[in-house]
Amino acid sequence: MDLASKKNTANVGSKEIDPIKPKSPRSSLSPFSLKLGDNVPRNPHFDPKKMDPLVKHQPPKSLEPPPSTRGTNSEGDLKHNTYSSDGDSLAMRKNAPKNLHYDPKKIVPLTTSETYSPSARNHHHHRTKSPDKKRAPRHNGDYAYGDNLVGPSAQPFKPHTGGDVRWDAINSIASKGPQIGLDNFRLLKRLGYGDIGSVYLADLRGTNAVFAMKVMDKASLASRNKLLRAQTEREILSLLDHPFLPTLYSYFETDKFYCLVMEFCSGGNLHSLRQKQPSRRFTEEAARFYASEVLLALEYLHMLGVVYRDLKPENILVRDEGHIMLSDFDLSLRCTFNPTLVKSSSVCSGGGAILNEEFAVNGCMHPSAFLPRLLPSKKTRKAKSDSGLGGLSMPELMAEPTDVRSMSFVGTHEYLAPEIIRGEGHGSAVDWWTFGIFLYELLHGTTPFKGQGNRATLHNVVGQPLKFPDTPHVSSAARDLIRGLLVKDPHRRIAYTRGATEIKQHPFFEGVNWALVRSAAPPHIPDPVDLGPYAAARGKTKSHGGGDHCNSMKPEPLVACAAGPTDDTAYIDFEYF
């Protein structure tokens, strides 16, 4: 594929995606997937396993599409396309930017419920060579097209969860029936609740696996005009494959509810954990650990064109092993975005030169499920000897969707960025403002602009300068980073242009091995949670003829199907919101 043909896509601006404005159906443009053995255009850096999930690949005209396994409903196929704010499907535009690294497996299928276990991924290659052996399906349930909730019925491969026993449990049940649904789970206890749903501790019948199931009431969402928020969260979760972000194991719906099945984090959230610390604050070493993992998660989200917009300790969950996981994506903003690779020396000098393809692919570390589009200019192609191949400068991944704009007033008052309060429109820089508030709270035990009420808090955010108390004492590096993040003008805020790359290089994170953060020892390991009493009480309730009342929940407020005490104070110290 000639990269020169894509030079005009380098300056494509970020646009907020509106997934509910499809045009009239065009049955002739139904999407289909390429098989790895088909005549895929040859390219020395073409990797069908690492491509952009937002743009559909268009095969050569001579290539006949394989028989579709998704049915022939062209309207359903059209709903699978990604739509821009002007209503056009990005997949159907004739001038849509082509992507060298498109992966058909990252486009999640619409109506099929057949997929495969990540733990069996290594065996999948051998099975495909033998036509006599059938693949073991993994069923995640079908999606309905009503109420604007459309999308995938099964998850793509998640490389970092390849050995996850929860996938094995899901697959063992999926192989026995047509699809996974609410009847396959027992809801043991309500763990938390939020604006669009409640989260329950659930075990998968016939296995020893437990999950966190987010249940959203359809009628409540429709009456409060929040269907789009539920759809956004589900779509974003289906894209994620990162150790500090949640894995969507299954999605299904009933007549009354939408259900998302995710990982159960027994360690609670960082807000609760901070309350248990001496003086209700973390040490600088512990704060650096949690901030580094959150920073990597935000960087990955920005690579995908996702602005998180709801960072706060309550949304940072602690896994069993002590590492963190971001949660609650219903306020997030999706946009089209093309990350690029640049030389660090050029960025620092303001040159912003883009690397040529060969050096960028071979010399840059990138997430296992994402390979950014390479956008070389004429200058970098002609002056190949000047691209820094023989120098000591290392490449940087520029993954900051600075052009995206939203006018929504969303977030928690103490964490709202000034540009949101002023109604000026906001972009990815709001995540770096909230990251500064987050770091301040970890170190000081409170937020910097908190007032007597919400109105006073908003006034302080916009009009009051940042101040540090005399105690507790924090390092000058920590204060300097927080000052850079809490600049009220988003254009002057640290990381506005270079994103997480600039923050990683700050002295506060000196000594952090970013490639091995996942292997670092956490400052706190949660105590094991004994789930036996909940399961035993649940079985006792059923044996007394109570029936499976947890699977017959009423609309909002949802019934707390807890096996045991029903008061909220008795719940496990865990919130998903």
From Swiss-Prot:
Catalytic site positions: 310
Keyword Transferase part of the UniProt annotation: yes
Annotated segments matching region Disordered: 1-151
Listed Basic and acidic residues bias regions: 44-55
Catalytic activity: L-seryl-[protein] + ATP = O-phospho-L-seryl-[protein] + ADP + H(+); L-threonyl-[protein] + ATP = O-phospho-L-threonyl-[protein] + ADP + H(+)
Keywords: ATP-binding, Kinase, Nucleotide-binding, Serine/threonine-protein kinase, Transferase
Pfam families reported in the protein's UniProt record: Pkinase
Protein kinase domain residues: 185-509
Activity regulation details: Activated by PDPK1/PDK1.
Tissue expression as described in the entry: Specifically expressed in pollen grains.
Quaternary structure and interacting proteins, as annotated: Interacts with PDPK1/PDK1.
PANTHER family in alphabetical order: FLIPPASE KINASE 1-RELATED
Protein name: Serine/threonine-protein kinase AGC1-5
Species annotation: Arabidopsis thaliana (Mouse-ear cress)
